[in-house]
Amino acid sequence: MIQTESMLEVADNSGARRVQCIKVLGGSHRRYAGIGDIIKVTVKEAIPRGRVKKGDVMTAVVVRTRKGVRRPDGSLIRFDENAAVLLNNNKAPVGTRIFGPVTRELRTEQFMKIISLAPEVL
Protein backbone atom coordinates (compact mmCIF):
# COMPACT_ATOMS: atom_id res chain seq x y z
CA MET A 1 0.00 0.00 0.00
CA ILE A 2 1.85 3.03 -1.33
CA GLN A 3 0.71 6.60 -0.79
CA THR A 4 2.13 10.08 -1.34
CA GLU A 5 5.52 10.54 0.40
CA SER A 6 6.17 6.76 0.53
CA MET A 7 9.79 5.77 -0.12
CA LEU A 8 10.45 2.81 -2.43
CA GLU A 9 13.49 0.85 -3.56
CA VAL A 10 14.13 0.69 -7.32
CA ALA A 11 14.13 -2.85 -8.72
CA ASP A 12 15.96 -2.15 -12.00
CA ASN A 13 19.33 -0.95 -13.30
CA SER A 14 18.17 2.51 -14.40
CA GLY A 15 20.62 4.19 -12.00
CA ALA A 16 18.13 5.19 -9.31
CA ARG A 17 18.38 3.52 -5.90
CA ARG A 18 15.51 5.09 -3.92
CA VAL A 19 12.46 7.00 -5.09
CA GLN A 20 9.64 8.83 -3.34
CA CYS A 21 6.02 8.64 -4.46
CA ILE A 22 4.62 12.07 -5.25
CA LYS A 23 1.28 11.01 -6.80
CA VAL A 24 -0.87 7.91 -7.15
CA LEU A 25 -2.26 7.87 -10.69
CA GLY A 26 -5.74 6.67 -11.64
CA GLY A 27 -8.59 8.70 -10.21
CA SER A 28 -8.88 12.23 -8.90
CA HIS A 29 -8.64 11.45 -5.17
CA ARG A 30 -7.01 8.03 -5.20
CA ARG A 31 -5.02 7.53 -2.00
CA TYR A 32 -3.26 4.15 -2.20
CA ALA A 33 -1.38 2.17 -4.84
CA GLY A 34 -0.80 -1.58 -4.73
CA ILE A 35 1.15 -4.05 -6.86
CA GLY A 36 0.68 -3.31 -10.56
CA ASP A 37 -0.44 0.30 -10.04
CA ILE A 38 1.28 3.25 -11.71
CA ILE A 39 2.63 6.13 -9.61
CA LYS A 40 4.62 9.33 -10.17
CA VAL A 41 7.95 9.33 -8.34
CA THR A 42 10.93 11.58 -7.82
CA VAL A 43 14.45 10.15 -7.61
CA LYS A 44 15.90 10.70 -4.13
CA GLU A 45 19.09 8.62 -4.43
CA ALA A 46 20.95 7.67 -7.62
CA ILE A 47 24.28 6.18 -8.61
CA PRO A 48 26.83 8.15 -10.65
CA ARG A 49 26.67 7.74 -14.43
CA GLY A 50 23.18 6.23 -14.33
CA ARG A 51 20.39 6.83 -16.82
CA VAL A 52 18.43 8.90 -14.30
CA LYS A 53 19.62 11.64 -11.98
CA LYS A 54 18.60 12.73 -8.50
CA GLY A 55 15.58 15.01 -8.71
CA ASP A 56 14.18 13.52 -11.93
CA VAL A 57 10.39 13.05 -11.95
CA MET A 58 9.47 9.68 -13.47
CA THR A 59 6.57 7.28 -13.83
CA ALA A 60 6.91 3.92 -12.06
CA VAL A 61 4.97 0.70 -11.54
CA VAL A 62 4.83 -0.87 -8.07
CA VAL A 63 6.23 -4.44 -8.18
CA ARG A 64 6.60 -5.34 -4.47
CA THR A 65 4.85 -4.10 -1.32
CA ARG A 66 5.06 -4.98 2.34
CA LYS A 67 1.26 -5.03 2.38
CA GLY A 68 1.24 -7.77 -0.26
CA VAL A 69 -1.49 -9.00 -2.58
CA ARG A 70 -4.33 -11.42 -1.84
CA ARG A 71 -4.89 -14.20 -4.39
CA PRO A 72 -8.33 -15.64 -5.25
CA ASP A 73 -7.39 -18.92 -3.51
CA GLY A 74 -6.90 -17.01 -0.24
CA SER A 75 -3.10 -16.99 -0.19
CA LEU A 76 -1.21 -13.78 0.55
CA ILE A 77 2.05 -12.82 -1.20
CA ARG A 78 4.00 -10.16 0.70
CA PHE A 79 7.56 -8.86 0.58
CA ASP A 80 10.17 -7.33 2.89
CA GLU A 81 10.32 -4.04 1.00
CA ASN A 82 8.37 -1.68 -1.19
CA ALA A 83 9.86 -1.62 -4.69
CA ALA A 84 9.08 -0.09 -8.08
CA VAL A 85 10.35 -0.24 -11.66
CA LEU A 86 10.85 3.07 -13.48
CA LEU A 87 8.98 3.54 -16.76
CA ASN A 88 9.44 5.88 -19.72
CA ASN A 89 6.64 7.77 -21.49
CA ASN A 90 5.65 4.63 -23.46
CA LYS A 91 5.21 2.60 -20.22
CA ALA A 92 8.32 0.56 -21.07
CA PRO A 93 10.98 -0.05 -18.39
CA VAL A 94 13.91 2.40 -18.37
CA GLY A 95 16.35 -0.28 -17.17
CA THR A 96 17.40 -3.43 -18.99
CA ARG A 97 17.42 -5.71 -15.93
CA ILE A 98 14.95 -6.33 -13.10
CA PHE A 99 16.19 -7.33 -9.63
CA GLY A 100 14.21 -9.51 -7.25
CA PRO A 101 10.91 -11.35 -7.64
CA VAL A 102 7.71 -9.89 -9.08
CA THR A 103 4.14 -11.19 -8.84
CA ARG A 104 1.85 -12.70 -11.46
CA GLU A 105 -0.49 -9.72 -11.04
CA LEU A 106 1.83 -7.74 -13.35
CA ARG A 107 1.05 -10.15 -16.21
CA THR A 108 -1.01 -7.67 -18.23
CA GLU A 109 -0.50 -6.44 -21.77
CA GLN A 110 1.51 -3.37 -20.74
CA PHE A 111 3.90 -5.03 -18.24
CA MET A 112 4.89 -8.23 -20.08
CA LYS A 113 8.38 -6.78 -20.64
CA ILE A 114 8.89 -6.56 -16.86
CA ILE A 115 7.67 -10.15 -16.43
CA SER A 116 10.11 -11.39 -19.09
CA LEU A 117 13.07 -9.55 -17.52
CA ALA A 118 12.32 -10.62 -13.94
CA PRO A 119 14.41 -13.48 -12.51
CA GLU A 120 11.42 -14.93 -10.62
CA VAL A 121 7.65 -14.59 -10.99
CA LEU A 122 5.62 -15.55 -7.91
From Swiss-Prot:
SUPFAM superfamilies: Ribosomal protein L14. GO terms for biological process: translation. InterPro entries: Ribosomal_uL14, Ribosomal_uL14_bac-type, Ribosomal_uL14_CS, Ribosomal_uL14_sf. Keywords: Ribonucleoprotein, Ribosomal protein, RNA-binding, rRNA-binding. One of its GO terms (molecular function) is structural constituent of ribosome. The keyword Ribonucleoprotein applies. One of its GO terms (cellular component) is cytosolic large ribosomal subunit. PANTHER family: 50S/60S RIBOSOMAL PROTEIN L14/L23 (PTHR11761), LARGE RIBOSOMAL SUBUNIT PROTEIN UL14M (PTHR11761:SF3). Part of the 50S ribosomal subunit. Forms a cluster with proteins L3 and L19. In the 70S ribosome, L14 and L19 interact and together make contacts with the 16S rRNA in bridges B5 and B8. NCBIfam families: rplN_bact. Binds to 23S rRNA. Forms part of two intersubunit bridges in the 70S ribosome. Belongs to the universal ribosomal protein uL14 family. This is Large ribosomal subunit protein uL14.
